[in-house]
Regions:
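Kelch-like beta-propeller repeat domains
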Residues: 12-374
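Secretory targeting and sorting signals
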Residues: 1-12
Length: 374
């Protein structure tokens, strides 16, 4: 893992075809049960042509600076910042390990303390595996996790799970109506959590009393890990990865409103981030496009404006909103081929400035970060 410091001037893991995504993830579960893609990492020195093309001159004050590479006990497929400043990360059984556990009975997890770099093993031992789950923070700072991986055929599980950051303890929640694999969980303004996709077309809501409510009149087939954020009107706003923009009213049994097309791109494995109230940046995805767009959902219907393209085409990258409102793009690959292309990793970070609508190329990382990065 590396840390990038940027001078001041915040799983994307999405596909439109569940069958296609299952085929890609099956690669990671074959030939020994649990061989993960982290065993196929490539450092920058092994891709000289791409690194040379991405070379960026400047001081750390201009282009940022990556810290040293350090080993972690897990591949952080999912990670969450906790109220105490520590970071929870978890992955599949067998990740970064020689042994295999095809029974899917636990999940490797760690809590990292950035102040000292220490790691605490907090593996989940509840008899199931939350690899390929979705999560959101509850108002008390704990995490609510939905779904996971049931078997070698990549079926989802019905389990929901809680993580208590004060005690580092896991506990089971209510079972969903159907198993979910790669769902999205979205924290709503009223403290509830919206669970979408992961296989089933009918969303569910975790209510504040801890029970689940089906949005039975809002069934709609969606991509795995759909992009949802909460709009100022309280609706869950859907922005991708496919181009049709929608709003989901999670009250009662639910209802959809369909808006216009965002653009003409299916941004599978793209990135999205709400960088301001009611304003969202989407960038990359699909055939590793460089294009980006800004969606404003503050009005009665969304508006879409183009913004400057990134310097590098990316998919499987991450967008992170920083404290000053800029958006950091890291990782991904530029080939648009399959789940991973180790010869097409994008090593340079880029920083998008909402005031100017432009990107600035930053320092290059040492190791490619693509599929299952966070």
């Amino acid at each position: 893992m590396l840390a990038l410091t940027v001078a001041a001037s915040a799983s994307a893991h999405d596909v439109s075809s569940p069958a296609g995504h299952a085929a890609e993830d099956a690669v990671t579960l074959s030939a020994g049960g649990e061989q993960r893609l982290n065993q196929q990492t490539l450092d920058a020195s092994k891709a000289p042509a791409l690194v040379a093309a991405a070379a960026t001159a400047g001081t750390p004050a201009d282009i940022g600076q990556w810290g040293p590479v350090v080993d972690w006990p897990v591949v952080a497929i999912n990670s969450a910042l906790l109220p105490n400043g520590r970071v929870l990360a978890y992955d599949s059984v067998g990740d970064k390990a020689t042994e295999t556990f095809p029974g899917q009975t636990f999940t490797r997890a760690t809590v990292w303390d950035p102040s000292g770099g220490g790691q605490t093993d907090v593996r989940l031992n509840l008899g199931y595996n939350i690899f390929c789950s979705g999560f959101a923070h509850l108002m008390d700072g704990s995490l609510f996790i939905a779904g996971g991986n049931k078997d070698q055929q990549l079926n989802g599980i019905v389990n929901t799970t809680y993580f208590n950051p004060d005690t580092n303890q896991w506990s089971g929640g209510p079972n969903m109506a159907a198993g979910r694999w790669y769902p999205t969980v979205t924290a709503l303004d009223n403290g509830e959590q919206l669970i979408t996709s992961g296989g089933p077309s009918t969303p569910e809501v975790r209510q504040n009393d801890g029970t689940l409510r089906s949005l039975s009149t809002a069934s709609l087939g969606q991509p795995l890990y759909p992009w949802f954020d909460v709009a100022p009107n309280g609706r869950a706003f859907y922005s991708g990865p496919d181009p049709t923009l929608r709003g989901l009213d999670p009250s009662g049994t639910g209802s959809w409103q369909t808006y216009q097309q965002r653009d003409a791109i299916n941004r599978d494995y793209g990135g999205h981030a709400f960088f301001d109230v009611g304003k969202e940046l989407v960038a990359g995805g699909g055939p590793s496009t460089t294009s980006a767009a800004v969606i404003d959902v503050n009005g009665s219907s969304p508006t879409v404006d183009s913004t400057a393209p990134m310097a590098f085409g990316r998919r499987q990258h991450n967008l992170t909103v920083l404290a000053d409102g800029t958006v950091l793009a890291t990782g991904g690959n530029s080939s648009g081929a399959g789940a991973v292309d180790l010869n097409a990793g994008v090593y340079n970070a880029e920083l998008w400035n909402p005031a100017t609508g432009t990107w600035r190329t930053l320092a290059a990382m040492q190791i490619t970060r693509q599929y299952h990065s966070t």
